[in-house]
Swiss-Prot record:
This is Transcriptional regulator RamR. The keyword Transcription applies. Binding of RamR to the promoter region of the ramA gene is significantly reduced as a result of deletions of various short sequences; deletion of two consecutive bases probably contributes to the multi-drug resistance phenotype of the BN10055 clinical isolate. RamR binds to various chemicals in vitro, including bile acids, such as cholic and chenodeoxycholic acids, and antimicrobial drugs, such as berberine, crystal violet, dequalinium, ethidium bromide and rhodamine 6G. Homodimer. May bind DNA either as a homodimer or as a pair of homodimers. Various chemicals reduce DNA-binding in vitro, including bile acids, such as cholic and chenodeoxycholic acids, and antimicrobial drugs, such as berberine, crystal violet, dequalinium, ethidium bromide and rhodamine 6G. Binds small regulatory RNA StyR3. Transcriptional regulator. Represses the transcription of the transcriptional activator RamA and, thereby, leads to repression of the expression of the efflux pump subunits AcrA and AcrB, and TolC. Acts by binding directly to the promoter region of the ramA gene. Promoter binding may be inhibited partially by the small regulatory RNA StyR3, perhaps thereby ensuring a basal level of expression of RamA. The keyword Heme does not apply.
Length: 193
């Protein structure tokens, strides 16, 4: 009879995968992930049948953490798309600065070709306000299947640059975050907004 799965082991594997992917990208080996979680590699595959399943599960795990962080402070009375987008940008940057390994990992995962359509849909469903806001304000080309990953990559590159400068010079972090937002807004959204 198979032993029941432990939630603690699963969380340890997800945390080890976060660190490994943040450091080495999606090429991080399952052996390293398992070792850093304190389990045998075979144990990893009891929890995740394939590395792709681990990648998709980790993406959803990190996305849920990020979305919970953003939703926690969300003022749902804001109706202006630019103001709402600024709030989400600020929350995203704050989360990334407070959790740099998680941010590096989610960035690697978001632009990988390993995410399934189901995973992308589940991630979109976690924060419907964000999905709706994107449909209202993001250029339609970046909402298309063909260019969505490119648009995500642009957003993430601008966010990463903003985080790098904010972390290097905390006294000017607010200025960098505001300038980063304006650059992102002009690059990815419809001009009529």
């Amino acid at each position: 009879m198979a032993r029941p799965k432990s939630e603690d082991k699963k969380q340890a594997l997800l945390e080890a995968a976060t660190q490994a992917i943040a450091q080495s990208g999606i090429a991080a080996s399952t052996a390293v992930i398992a070792r850093n979680a304190g389990v045998a590699e075979g144990t990893l595959f009891r929890y995740f049948a394939t590395k792709d399943e681990l990648i998709n599960t980790l993406y959803l795990h990190l996305k849920q953490d990020l979305c919970q962080s953003m939703i926690m402070e969300l003022d749902r009375s804001i109706t202006d798309a630019k103001m709402m987008t600024r709030f989400i940008w600020n929350s995203y940057i704050s989360w990334g600065l407070n959790h740099p390994a998680r941010h590096r990992a989610i960035r690697q995962l978001a632009v990988s070709e390993k995410l399934t359509k189901e995973t992308e849909q589940r991630a979109d469903d976690m924060f419907p306000e964000l999905r709706d806001l994107c449909h209202r304000s993001v250029l339609m080309v970046f909402m298309s299947d063909e260019y969505r990953a490119f648009g995500d990559g642009l957003f993430l590159a601008l966010a990463e640059t903003t985080m790098d400068f904010a972390a290097r010079d905390p006294a000017r972090a607010g200025e960098y975050i505001a300038l980063g937002f304006e650059a992102m807004w002009r690059a990815l959204t419809r001009e009529e907004q």
